[in-house]
Amino acid sequence: MDSEESRCFSGYDGNRFKLVILASQRAHELSSGAATLVDRQGDKNTVVALREIASNQLDLSTVFGLAVQRCRKYLEEFAGSRGIAGHSSHVSPSRSSRHTGLGKSFVDNKSTYSASFLDQDKFLSGGKDDGIEGF
């Protein structure tokens, strides 16, 4: 790992998949005009986001909440634009049923759509059951 990578990751000891989601959301915020919490040092938004996470200057639960909202909005728009009727082929019942209370529904005039979301506490806790299989 070179000095640039170690500078970004030195303060973060969580799951790398969670890091990607959090950094993506924060980079999106920075691209939308949010103020940086660390010196930019000529870095791109993704690197700045990683350095902010590593420095523990962000409220990760807030960043996670914004990522979930963005995901829900995207799924609602996607389902509406596709006119998906009555079934959810993207989420298997066995996967969503093992995450108690994590299924969310999207309702329109025609039908109900389901999607499974990882809840904030499990996401931030770094627990073994983080919804990512095979890694």
UniProtKB/Swiss-Prot annotation:
This protein's record includes keyword Plastid: no
Organism: Anaplasma phagocytophilum (strain HZ)
Role played: Promotes RNA polymerase assembly. Latches the N- and C-terminal regions of the beta' subunit thereby facilitating its interaction with the beta and alpha subunits.
Matching InterPro entries: DNA-dir_RNA_pol_omega (IPR003716), Pol_omega/Rpo6/RPB6 (IPR006110), RPB6/omega-like_sf (IPR036161)
Keyword Transferase set for record: yes
Residue segments, region Disordered: 84-106
Any one Pfam family match given in the protein's UniProt record, by short name: RNA_pol_Rpb6
Stated family: Belongs to the RNA polymerase subunit omega family.
Domain of life: Bacteria
Quaternary organization: The RNAP catalytic core consists of 2 alpha, 1 beta, 1 beta' and 1 omega subunit. When a sigma factor is associated with the core the holoenzyme is formed, which can initiate transcription.
Coiled-coil regions listed in the entry: none
EC number: 2.7.7.6
Molecular function GO labels: DNA binding; DNA-directed RNA polymerase activity
Record keywords, A-Z: DNA-directed RNA polymerase, Nucleotidyltransferase, Transcription, Transferase
Phylogenetic placement of the source organism: Bacteria, Pseudomonadati, Pseudomonadota, Alphaproteobacteria, Rickettsiales
Gene (UniProt): rpoZ
Annotated GO CC locations: DNA-directed RNA polymerase complex
Catalytic reactions on record: RNA(n) + a ribonucleoside 5'-triphosphate = RNA(n+1) + diphosphate
UniProt name for this protein: DNA-directed RNA polymerase subunit omega
Membrane spanning stretches: none
GO biological process: DNA-templated transcription
